Amino acid sequence: IVVTFAIEEEVIDVPLKDAFIVPIVTGIGKANAAFSLTRAVLLEKPDMVLNIGTAGTQKHSVGDVFVCDHFIDRDLSLLNLPGITSELHTEHLLFNPYGVVNTGDDFVTDSEVLHGDVIDMEAFAEALVCKRMNIPFVSVKYITDIVGKNSLKAWEDKLSDARKGYEE
């Protein structure tokens, strides 16, 4: 199992019995995530990919955890061009999925209304890599901040809480 984290501060132990875990730090953003995950998939040939990370929200609470099956690329969704994939689902690959991730290459700090339960910068890219390579993908997000409420500072302050929350 390849387990992805955007930054070193998000890395936690993932104790899955009888599983060989390969943790990778992808870097922030869709391009870094897609590159790092593709390289890891080609080298490791995993049975599945688990993305663990932090995210913001507009409608839930700090400390909530979401298992996500629906992914939106907020940057590509603005283009509305034929052949562009800006939304995908991975529910056929998961058990008991719920949650929508809205992914883009910006740290959202204003209260612009965005579709989704959680807002991040990597999950769509990783879901797309896995879907195209036919690898089961699970994304688990810990809410660290409420968009529009000093989001960047809140995210920085809550990183350690996210690690503790996942480990519980």
What spans do the regions from the language model cover?
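Gly/serine-rich nucleotide phosphate-binding loop at the start of the catalytic core
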Residues: I7
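Glycine-rich phosphate- or other oxyanion-binding loops that anchor nucleotides, phosphorylated ligands
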Residues: V11-E168
